[in-house]
C-alpha cells in the first residue's frame, strides 16, 4: 500500500520532486530582486531631483530679487510688465494731451489775429513791452499771451467846403455887396487869386473870414452886359440894353441896374 502511494507521487513528498521545480523558484527570486532594484533607483532619482530644486535660486532681471521657486519669479515678472505697460500708456496720454493743447492755443492765436486785421501774418512773439502804459505781456505757465496792439482809428482828412460862385455888382461899395448863389458849371478859380471881371459883374467864390474880396474898378465907358456862361463877343438875344435888365435863364433876372445912371 505504502509503495503504491509513493509511486503515485504527491506534491508534498520531497523524494518525488519534478525536475523543473528548482528552476522556477530561482527565476521568481531573480525577478523580484530586479523589480526591487528598479524601485530603489526611482526613489533615489526623485530624492536627488528634490534636492536640486531646493538648492537652486531664481533671480529677477528687473529688480535683482531672488526666489526659491520659478512660480514666484513668474508672478513677480508679471507685475513688472504691468507697471511698464501703465507707464507707456501714461506717456502716450501726456503726449496726446500736450499736442491737443498746443493745437488749440495756435487756433486761438490765428483767430484773434484775423479779428484784429492781421490774417495771414505770423503770430508775434509772446513777450512785448509798451512804453506808454508800462504793459508787459508774456506767457504764464507755458501758455503764451497775445501782445496788445494799439489800434488807432483812421481819421479821414477834413473835406474843404464846397465852392459857390457868386455875382457881385461893381457900382456898389464892397460892404453893400449881396452875393447870389449860382450853380457851378465850370471849375472854380484857385484860392488867393484875384477874380476876373466880365462886363459889369465880378465872378468870385466863397471866401473865409480872413480873406478880403477886392473888386477891380469897372471900365469907364462900357455899358454892355454879359451873363456867366454866355459868349463875350456878342450879347445874348434876350438881353435888352435900353432898360438894363439881365434876363438870363440862370435865375439872375432880379438884379437890375440902370445903365444910363451908371454911364
From Swiss-Prot:
Region of interest (Disordered), residue spans: 1-51
Xref: SUPFAM superfamilies: beta-beta-alpha zinc fingers
UniProt keywords, alphabetically: Developmental protein, Differentiation, Metal-binding, Nucleus, Zinc, Zinc-finger
Gene Ontology molecular-function annotations: DNA-binding transcription factor activity; zinc ion binding
Subcellular location, record wording: Nucleus
Tissue note: Expressed in leaf primordia, inflorescence meristem, rachis branch meristems, floral meristem and floral organ primordia.
A cellular component term, taken from the record's GO annotations: nucleus
Comp. bias (Low complexity): 25-40
Reported consequences of knocking out the gene: Male sterility. Increased number of inflorescence branches, modified floral organ identities, flowers with varied numbers of inner floral organs and amorphous tissues without floral organ identity in whorls 3 and 4. Malformation of leaf blades until the fourth-leaf stage.
Chief place where the protein resides: nucleus
Zinc finger extent (C2H2-type): 58-80
Protein's GO biological process: cell differentiation; floral organ development; negative regulation of cell population proliferation; specification of carpel identity; specification of stamen identity
UniProt superkingdom: Eukaryota
UniProt function note: Regulates floral organ identity and cell proliferation in the inner floral whorls. Probably specifies the identities of lodicule and stamen through positive regulation of MADS16 expression. May contribute to morphogenesis by suppressing OSH1 expression in the lateral organs.
Protein name from the UniProt record: Zinc finger protein STAMENLESS 1
Source species: Oryza sativa subsp. japonica (Rice)
Lineage: Eukaryota, Viridiplantae, Streptophyta, Embryophyta, Tracheophyta
Amino acid at each position: 500500500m505504502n509503495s503504491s502511494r509513493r509511486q503515485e507521487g504527491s506534491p508534498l513528498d520531497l523524494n518525488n520532486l519534478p525536475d523543473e521545480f528548482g528552476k522556477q523558484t530561482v527565476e521568481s527570486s531573480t525577478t523580484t530582486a530586479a523589480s526591487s532594484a528598479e524601485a530603489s533607483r526611482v526613489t533615489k532619482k526623485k530624492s536627488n531631483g528634490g534636492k536640486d530644486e531646493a538648492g537652486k535660486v531664481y533671480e529677477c532681471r528687473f529688480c535683482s530679487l531672488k526666489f526659491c521657486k520659478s512660480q514666484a519669479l513668474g508672478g513677480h515678472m508679471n507685475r513688472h510688465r504691468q507697471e511698464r505697460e501703465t507707464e507707456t500708456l501714461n506717456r502716450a496720454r501726456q503726449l496726446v494731451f500736450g499736442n491737443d493743447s498746443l493745437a488749440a492755443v495756435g487756433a486761438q492765436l490765428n483767430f484773434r489775429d484775423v479779428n484784429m486785421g492781421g490774417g495771414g501774418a505770423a503770430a508775434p512773439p509772446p513777450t512785448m513791452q509798451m512804453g506808454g502804459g508800462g504793459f508787459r505781456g508774456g506767457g504764464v505757465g507755458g501758455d503764451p499771451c497775445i501782445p496788445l496792439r494799439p489800434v488807432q482809428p483812421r481819421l479821414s482828412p477834413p473835406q474843404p467846403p464846397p465852392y459857390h460862385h457868386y455875382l457881385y455888382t461893381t457900382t456898389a461899395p464892397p460892404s453893400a455887396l449881396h452875393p447870389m448863389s449860382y450853380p457851378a458849371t465850370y471849375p472854380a478859380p484857385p484860392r488867393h487869386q484875384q477874380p476876373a471881371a466880365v462886363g459889369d459883374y465880378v465872378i468870385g467864390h466863397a471866401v473865409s473870414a480872413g480873406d478880403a474880396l477886392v473888386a477891380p474898378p469897372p471900365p469907364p465907358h462900357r455899358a454892355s452886359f454879359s451873363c456867366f456862361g454866355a459868349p463875350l463877343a456878342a450879347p445874348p438875344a434876350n438881353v435888352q440894353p435900353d432898360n438894363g435888365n439881365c434876363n438870363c435863364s440862370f435865375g439872375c433876372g432880379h438884379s437890375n441896374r440902370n445903365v444910363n445912371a451908371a454911364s
